[in-house]
């Protein structure tokens, strides 16, 4: 993993302004992104403490897993004490049976930012769902809604032929989308083929932007600077991921998924149950029901491997955002550097 762009100790360098030019407007809100286990929650809370004498902070979660109630351990959800110390939004807003789309996130986040600003607080958007961040800046086209009949047909086809066969089908109708998806990425393959069958358009065609949309995205980036926590050493992040997964197992993650399975109305193809860790735990519990033995070592191995892959995808997304301010999350003073950079961007003395 290459070293992310470095920041000086004070954070974002002050812009060079022509003589007589007005200083740029201070950002309306801040965003903090990063791969899983990079320290985003700790960083967000540290900034809230540093800003407390100047301005209250409210956190808007940018995480597609934290929206689900009853999924606390496997998502590393902020604790009740952390949520009590700093207001958090877009956490526990859906039952695991319910979907939550990027379009819904954008609408909710934009509304919350306005409400938080009206209260005189700083909106701080924090998370690792890069699609949500991208949708905030670039906007999203009006893609067709989910079609239950088409989804059922695709699931039946996948059961008969396997998801790699559907990935090959996607490559014929939408090679651009297929190129960025793994043959086993059932959720995204299904959605891409669903869009094709419902609209007659490839999913990739919905991501093109007009010039006006591009200008609007540029304005959005100016009003909401993106800071990212990125590791210089991949092994450091892998170690953190393993430690966190072990801690989740110790805290009762398997029992959490067991309770979800016991509801009887959830299944492994739901977006909630496809979340990293939950899918692997669901499969392990299925194996336990079949054989009477829980393959805990296999669950740990597969869960950590899946989380590593998620982190890799998150870093790839971040590197496609050249306007971000990258901070090495594995540096000993990473939290201090992030706080100093954020305070500088806000015009607050460190």
UniProtKB/Swiss-Prot annotation:
Residues 63-66, 187-191, 274-279 are annotated as: Interaction with substrate tRNA. It catalyses: adenosine(37) in tRNA + dimethylallyl diphosphate = N(6)-dimethylallyladenosine(37) in tRNA + diphosphate. InterPro entries: Dimethylallyltransferase (IPR039657), IPT (IPR018022), P-loop_NTPase (IPR027417). Substrate binds at residues 36-41. GO terms for biological process: tRNA modification. GO terms for molecular function: ATP binding; tRNA dimethylallyltransferase activity. ATP binds at residues 34-41. Its EC number is 2.5.1.75. The record marks 129, 151 as: Interaction with substrate tRNA. It comes from the Bacteria. Keywords: ATP-binding, Magnesium, Nucleotide-binding, Transferase, tRNA processing. PANTHER family: TRNA DIMETHYLALLYLTRANSFERASE. Belongs to the IPP transferase family. Catalyzes the transfer of a dimethylallyl group onto the adenine at position 37 in tRNAs that read codons beginning with uridine, leading to the formation of N6-(dimethylallyl)adenosine (i(6)A). Monomer. NCBIfam families: miaA. HAMAP family: IPP_trans. This is tRNA dimethylallyltransferase. The gene is miaA.
